[in-house]
């Protein structure tokens, strides 16, 4: 299989993703001449970048989808031995300014989640990074019920942002979607607006999918007939 190449169709992309399943991260990294870190403490995004490279994804963390020509976003998801997600999933940065008039239909979150290629990867820390196996890919689009859940949370969370109630935002808000600081450190500040409508500095905020939501996606795939 020729990796790191352009996929002209959804079928071609899925063929590559299915081929990856069962290999270890070390085996794929070796094929791509990429060094494997001893651990992920300083290389948190390494697994995602490796899979992106292997599948020829281009967008990275840009607002567009990883495979924009196919309308597909790529997400690696670390799982434990029971197949349960080990962490929340970053979707996109929240617009802290110039957000008047944005609706769910036009939001980056909806755009990114219209169709997602999930790649489960062993993520338990006792397994050396190079020996972690890649799982079966899941091509997913939200059901009507899931989209309604996402929409409800997004609208609630955006209300806090638009009305400048940034100090009230915490990770407990939202049933399936949450807002959390997204920055390398506490000095990574960006422009925002407070309740008085004044420009202030704030930590960048990102939209994240809760583990229970992504667990449901994985479980639905396992239960679905082949």
Curated annotation (Swiss-Prot):
GO terms for molecular function: DNA binding; endonuclease activity. InterPro entries: DNA_mismatch_repair_MutH, DNA_rep_MutH/RE_typeII_Sau3AI, DNA_rep_MutH/T2_RE_sf, Restrct_endonuc-II-like. Keywords: Cytoplasm, DNA damage, DNA repair, Endonuclease, Hydrolase, Nuclease. It holds the Pfam family MutH. One of its GO terms (biological process) is DNA modification. Its main location: cytoplasm. GO terms for cellular component: cytoplasm. Signal peptide: none annotated. Coiled coil: none annotated. SUPFAM superfamilies: Restriction endonuclease-like. It is found in: Cytoplasm. Sequence-specific endonuclease that cleaves unmethylated GATC sequences. It is involved in DNA mismatch repair. Belongs to the MutH family. This is DNA mismatch repair protein MutH. It comes from Actinobacillus pleuropneumoniae serotype 3 (strain JL03). The lineage of its organism: Bacteria, Pseudomonadati, Pseudomonadota, Gammaproteobacteria, Pasteurellales.
